[in-house]
Amino acid sequence: TWTLQRHDPYPALAVDRHWSLVMANKSATGLLTGIGINIGDSMLDAALNSDALRNSIVNWPDVAHHILVRLRTESAYLGGDTILDAAADQLANEVQPTQEAETLPAIVPTIYRAGEIQLSLFSTIAQFGTAEDIALADLKIELMFPADDLTRNVFLAQNG
């Protein structure tokens, strides 16, 4: 929780191996509860089945393609995972790649629609590589950062 709380005013969250939301800081909680996602909910289910989430993301096709690649990468890293594979298969049936893999940008920001404004955030994801506790080893920490000045200013004003 220390890392998540210190990341305010920007969103930060922790998810488990199957993308269930385990913890979130104040900014992430505000962002996610606005689209119906709460602690304990599956971010995979939200990405696959929530019109509220999809409609709140301006660049959903780009983000969906990024999620698809991420799911396949995580499953391969784990030596195969039926839950991640099923989610990737479902998403692959719905999403057409927006660009060839060779031309994908290094960072795909997620652009959220928040009323009349658009908040553009990019993420870094960290995982504990030397954890002795398997539950801790399965946690991924996602720290979101503003991708533009407007987004930075909105988060600073809300939490300042």
Regions found by a protein language model. Give the residues of each.
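PAS-family sensory domains
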Residues: 2-3, 8-97, 114
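Residue-level signal for the start and early helices of compact helical domains
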Residues: 6, 23, 39, 103, ...
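Amphipathic alpha-helical interface segments
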Residues: 74-75, 79, 93-160
